[in-house]
Amino acid sequence: MVARSEEIVIVEEDTTAKCLMLLSRVGECGGGCGGDERVFRCKTCLKEFSSFQALGGHRASHKKLINSDNPSLLGSLSNKKTKTSHPCPICGVKFPMGQALGGHMRRHRNEKVSGSLVTRSFLPETTTVTALKKFSSGKRVACLDLDLDSMESLVNWKLELGRTISWS
């Protein structure tokens, strides 16, 4: 007759051996798999993908030009892209997308908010801001002169927050 402690050790060894056997077969198609792996196929080009998400991303690339054989449609689409620009009504900077203009407009709104944000009024009078310059690329950039004279020019700046910053 086998002692109780020996029986527990044998059961644990068997369980461990079974677990190791299962782990060694990870990736193989054994038992319940049946070779029935799911494949997602693109209806346009018949390319196959392992996940629905990958297929969805691929399908989006087919939808860029629906009627590419119609030259009048292609011409109107290309003309529309070049004509579309979104100018800022405040400073005149043009953006290729409305979303970029929206982010830019946030800057103008933040300048107008009083009591919660520091605005341009904290700059000393000696700081110069040059006008927007237009380069050959068609983009406008602001040129700021950041050459401050010394720390004395920074003393006692009055901010719109009502506080005074002073360095001693």
Swiss-Prot record:
* This protein's record includes keyword Metal-binding: yes
Spans traversing the lipid bilayer: none
User: In which tissues does this protein get expressed?
Assistant: Expressed in roots, stems and leaves.
What does the record note about the induction of this protein? Answer: By H(2)O(2), heat stress, wounding and cucumber mosaic virus (CMV).
Q: Which SUPFAM superfamilies match?
A: beta-beta-alpha zinc fingers
C2H2-type zinc finger locations on the chain: 40-62, 86-108
Localized where? Answer: Nucleus
Q: What is this protein called?
A: Zinc finger protein ZAT7
Originating species: Arabidopsis thaliana
